[in-house]
């Protein structure tokens, strides 16, 4: 059976330095490797993320990023001090990176996927 492993998600940007600095300086992403103005490989919350400039006709990437931070208020205060508009929406605080990508922060992870085994167990328990 094939078992792929994701080693990076690449984000294309027209504002490489600004986006790089936002993720590193504001969201505390760890720089794994970097070639200035060409790419930066980051680790953000355990997720590998590569930022590259749009050089060969690539479109600016868009996505929603979900982060869980146990004590998120300090991060939200830092974002506000840096001029980032933060909106609260139930358990999430929402803000955007400099190119408009939506980032949602909660204090705990949402359950996005349950394994087939846990679903079978849940169904049997309900019966």
Language model features by range: what are they?
Residues 30-62, 102-109:
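Conserved short beta-strand elements that form part of the metal-binding/catalytic scaffold
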């Amino acid at each position: 059976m094939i078992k792929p492993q994701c080693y990076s998600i690449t984000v294309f940007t027209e504002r490489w330095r600004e986006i790089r600095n936002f993720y590193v300086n504001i969201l505390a992403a760890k720089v794994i490797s970097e070639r200035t103005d060409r790419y930066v490989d980051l680790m953000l919350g355990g997720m590998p993320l590569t930022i590259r400039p749009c050089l060969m006709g690539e479109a600016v990437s868009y996505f929603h990023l979900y982060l869980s931070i146990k004590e998120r208020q300090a991060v939200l205060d830092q974002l506000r001090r840096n001029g980032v508009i933060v909106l609260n929406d139930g358990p999430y605080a929402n803000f955007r990176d400099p190119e408009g990508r939506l980032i949602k922060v909660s204090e705990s992870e949402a359950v996005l996927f349950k394994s087939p085994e846990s679903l079978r167990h849940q169904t049997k328990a309900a019966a």
